[in-house]
């Protein structure tokens, strides 16, 4: 999910999120933040089932910062951006670095490196088994 690479997320109340990479025969995306965003059990549930997460559920897990009515999405996002833009830039950068350092201390760089290697291994496996880097439901399992 592209949203995982975002520092802040404002979602419309009708938004839904899904990571269906397992359905494509791949064990996750190149940017893999699932355990950090959801915790291990919820990450496994979402990946193993390719289940959908409503905007409200995403907010409850901390995956999105705010949920607003669709009609207010742009205004709410611009408001948040202007509040942040008015802050001292260096202090913002240092706050972001501190938060990222905390994640790094929890092993995120090693996890990212490992998942990228496993992701590529899945592509290699699919090339050998299916003749393409991703699989589809129509392909019969060997």
Annotate each PLM feature.
Residues 54-55, 75, 79-82, 86-142:
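C-terminal alpha-helix plus adjacent terminal tail
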């Amino acid at each position: 999910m592209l949203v995982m690479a975002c520092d802040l997320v404002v979602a419309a109340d009708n938004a839904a999120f899904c990571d269906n990479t397992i359905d494509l025969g791949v064990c996750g995306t190149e940017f893999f933040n699932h355990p950090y965003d959801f915790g291990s059990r919820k990450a496994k549930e979402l990946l193993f089932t390719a289940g959908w997460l409503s905007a409200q559920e995403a907010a409850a897990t901390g995956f999105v910062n705010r949920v607003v009515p669709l009609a207010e999405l742009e205004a709410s996002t611009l408001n948040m951006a202007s509040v942040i833009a008015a802050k001292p830039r260096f202090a913002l950068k240092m706050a972001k670095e501190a938060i990222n350092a905390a994640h790094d201390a929890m092993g995120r760089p090693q996890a990212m490196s490992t998942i990228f290697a496993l992701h590529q291994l899945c592509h290699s496996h699919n090339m050998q088994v299916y003749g393409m880097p991703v699989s589809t439901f129509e392909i019969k399992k060997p």
